[in-house]
Amino acid sequence: MAHKKGTGSTRNGRDSRAQRLGVKRYGGQVVKAGNILVRQRGTKVYPGNNVGRGSDDTLFALIDGIVTFEYKTRSQKKVSVYPVAAE
């Protein structure tokens, strides 16, 4: 007879990868055209000036410039990119 108990196995121990959503570039940061600004599901933040929207609602910069978060209405946020003034 065995003097040690056999080790059981478990069916747990797996988890799915998180979706990595959220703001990727914050207000005041300098971005290049094509940089992702916000990854989101649905339009939590709307595209403003010089910002494009991908098929999965990802917002990205269309030009080089500075990121600004603004309010479209009282409750709707938008993100815009404004060109850096040449000095």
Swiss-Prot record:
One of its GO terms (cellular component) is cytosolic large ribosomal subunit. Residues 1-20 are annotated as: Disordered. Pfam families: Ribosomal_L27. GO terms for biological process: translation. One of its GO terms (molecular function) is structural constituent of ribosome. It comes from the Bacteria. Keywords: Ribonucleoprotein, Ribosomal protein. InterPro entries: Ribosomal_bL27, Ribosomal_bL27_CS. PROSITE patterns: RIBOSOMAL_L27. Belongs to the bacterial ribosomal protein bL27 family. This is Large ribosomal subunit protein bL27. It comes from Rippkaea orientalis (strain PCC 8801 / RF-1) (Cyanothece sp. (strain PCC 8801)).
